[in-house]
A protein has these predicted regions:
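Alpha-helical subdomain
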Residues: 1-173
Length: 173
């Protein structure tokens, strides 16, 4: 969006993670390896294979060897498949049914099913192996008390989805 401050410094790059090289797509879009970079991969990790995500992390790490980078991503917790009750707030009715509905609707809306789910430890490991350290890892439950509570819009426990994590990681220096 042009109304963003410093939008001239923002480049959106599309990539088919299964068939294209992220490095090639970024370099073709004018990526400058000498400048600090913020990468954003929100709503992507659940749609691509774990191998594609790991490969993406490796490419970003190699691209930014000579400078710093920040990586923002979201991931869907593996508990959605393993224990849906833990992904929803206390008192949430029929969590298994809701988990299946969410996966079904996301596949229909995006035209692709969710195929990759992660534990926090797995994401931390992948980031660490590729030169990043997590600075923040939050769920809607965390954001509820931080942002909604102070303005009187706190979500009740049975309205909270804890399935998606929002992560900020920074390249290790």
């Amino acid at each position: 969006p042009k109304e963003l401050p410093n939008s001239e410094n923002v480049t959106y790059v599309t990539v088919d993670f299964a068939h294209q090289s992220l490095t090639e797509r970024l370099l073709n879009a004018g990526f400058d390896r000498t400048k600090s970079t913020v990468f954003t991969l929100e709503g992507v990790t659940q749609y691509i294979s774990k191998e594609a995500f790991n490969s993406t992390m490796k490419e970003m790490s190699r691209l930014c060897q000579k400078t710093s980078s920040i990586f923002a991503l979201s991931f869907v917790n593996e508990l959605l498949n393993k224990n849906p009750e833990d992904c929803f707030g206390r008192g949430y009715l029929n969590p298994e049914k809701k988990a299946n509905l969410i996966k079904k609707l996301s596949a229909k809306a995006a035209g692709e099913p969710w195929i990759s789910f992660y534990s926090t430890e797995e994401i931390e490991g992948l980031l660490s192996e590729n030169g990043y350290s997590i600075k923040e890892n939050v769920t809607l439950e965390d954001l509820n008390s931080l942002y909604f509570g102070p303005v009187g819009r706190t979500l009740s426990e049975n309205e909270i989805f804890k399935l998606e994590h929002f992560v900020i990681a920074e390249s290790k220096e």
